[in-house]
Amino acid sequence: GMLNLANAQRYGRMGEYREDNTAILTNPCGEISLADKETCNLSEIFPTRCYGPEEFFNAIRYATLYSSTVALLPTHRRETNNIIMKNRRIGVSISGIAQWASGFNKEGWSKNMNYSEISKYLDSGYKIVRSENKRLARDAGVPESIRVTTIKPSGTISLLAGVTPGIHFPVSRYAIRRIRVGTQSPIIDALLNSNVPNEDDQFSANTKVFEFIIDHGPVRPCEEVSPWEQFALIRMVQKYWADNSVSATVYFDKESCKPEEIQKMLDLYIPELKSVSMLPHSGHGYAQAPYEPLTEEEYNKRVEETKIDFSNTKGNVPSGSVYCTGDNCVRV
């Protein structure tokens, strides 16, 4: 992985000088530059779940309202509050970009969606975030946010929306998605009784790794998207949308993509990015990897074999009155 701290401190969107000298590192996934003791404040929107541009732009307004409001809330630590009050940093993110570019969209979007069209929507969307954040900051009597947009990896949240994670292309249309579930979770019995394939987590005690199946729809898998195109897409999004960073992993074929070619990519794109990592499609050696390709036949077979029944699963666990009784409150 690579972090270009100079770019993170010097630029908002690439090419727009907007100083952020307090930033000294990023969060673990690399999408948000942070000062010492500063916190992340993220929200997320899904263009392929919107019925056209107007709904997309409205979703941007709501996400900006949410994050800008959260930026007003104090934490339990004075040093953190001080840097939050100074920067008011937020990160409105987008997921499902691969599906968006593939035309896998609801009615209201252009049938001929492409990167050029997306760049226009990103640029217009960014201006809405900036305008809304400035208005909200003025109404609250605080400085506008030093940074407002990002692309987070969204490996988990994207599953809830049924979209591809962040800027990433899927490993294949049909795939296994491995998810870690604690053995004390309310859903563990339903999963075990439904014969969802699972094994003990190799890295965490009292945790199971379950294999769920996904159909990403008619979108290109990362094996069909060259690393050059992936780098170019990251650069485009860093230029037109993200004034924080873009959290992205560029996938490549380690057999056909030689070290000299990878070096050329890094030499060309590192000066124009804030963060990026690279990983081979397969043979990477990571146990219990989040994604694994499936054939359509394997996918259909698992659909027939697995029927999960959550009807007896409770989402709440009663714990009594642990907060306030009369004039006395429990601090938790």
Regions found by a protein language model. Name each.
Residues 1-5, 13-54, 60-76, 86, ...:
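Catalytic alpha/beta core of large soluble enzyme barrels
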Residues 329:
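Short linear clamp-binding motif
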Residues 20, 33, 54-55, 80-89, ...:
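Alpha-helix capping and helix-loop boundary segments enriched in small/acidic/polar residues
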Residues 38, 93-96:
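Catalytic-loop motifs flanking and including active-site residues across diverse enzymes
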Residues 71-78, 96, 101-153:
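Internal maturation/activation junctions in enzymes
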